[in-house]
Amino acid sequence: MPGWRLLAQAGARVLGCGARGLGADPGLERRKNILFFVRNLHSKSSTWWDEHLSEENLSFVKQLVSDENKTQLTSKLNPLKDEPWPLHPWEPGSFRVGLIALKLGMMPLWTKDGQKHAVTLLQVQDCHVLKYTPKEDHNGKIAALTVGGKTVSRFYKPDSRLEFYRDLGLPPKQIHKIFHVTDNAVIKPGTPLYAAHFRPGQYVDVTAKTIGKGFQGVMKRWGFKGQPASHGQTKTHRRPGAISTGDIARVWPGTKMPGRMGNQNRTVYGLKVWRVNTKHNIIYVNGSVPGHKNCLVKIKDSTLPAYKDSCKNLPFPTYFPDGDEEELPEDLFDESVWQPSEPSITFA
């Protein structure tokens, strides 16, 4: 291991050595020992609030920031009272905005005919529209809305990013995602988005970053069968075998070979929404979703041809709690889902 790495792992220690130990002239022995300070590369980087605030003041500042974030979020709860942009009806071919949600985990769910389904719970936390980009400034074909999800501390955000949020009147967000929308589905920046944006029975597409597995061989990465375990095989049990032929004298692009596995954005299409909890903003989607627990995922209306026109019965362009729609119950279920409040056995 190199010497500098050993010193870095040792932390901020004081090393003393004489001038003779440094290979200097013997006449310099009478000088005082030279001190070396090694900065620990693994230590937490300090910021202004780490250095200049006491523990008592630090807790006060964090509480003050938390209260300010709650005030900003509360001020955005009634977007229809803040002169919203004109609302337009749904038309065939319209594209709505999507949501950013937190993956909570999985649980079972039963239908009325007794079938068991595994569902993934996705919670919408402080999801807001941040920016509108007209199609002239985006790609010339379709407009875009930038959506931010999950409020985070402003202590680690640069001033340029904080200024953007100050103009919006919102706390900083952990992640931003871009959604393509048609002109009739444009929403004013600062509008909050809720889980009721989606309704039970519809189908959605979920995008997230898969769990990273590191560098893996072809058997784990691509599911290769491998080679025989005996009968003359020497150190080739898990190898891929031939990767090309001699006549072409090259390896074709896209050949399945060992490499890094996972840690890539993947989309699962056509997941059915079984249940929506409007109190805690939780969406129950069918099956598994890429990513680990507590990761942020991107949800939008399914683009599969079979479900592309299923948005006509959904809130358009999004759900407004202060709109003309009646107050929603705490739980919305698909018509085929058995509700926990119902009896499990009925007699005719």
UniProtKB/Swiss-Prot annotation:
One matching Pfam family: Ribosomal_L3
Gene3D superfamilies, A to Z: Translation factors (2.40.30.10)
Subcellular location: Mitochondrion
Signal peptide location: none
GO biological process: one example: translation
One GO cellular component, as annotated: mitochondrial inner membrane
InterPro entries hit by this protein: Ribosomal_uL3 (IPR000597), Ribosomal_uL3_bac/org-type (IPR019927), Ribosomal_uL3_CS (IPR019926), Transl_B-barrel_sf (IPR009000)
Subunit text: Component of the mitochondrial ribosome large subunit (39S) which comprises a 16S rRNA and about 50 distinct proteins.
Family that this chain belongs to: Belongs to the universal ribosomal protein uL3 family.
Protein name: Large ribosomal subunit protein uL3m
Classification lineage: Eukaryota, Metazoa, Chordata, Craniata, Vertebrata
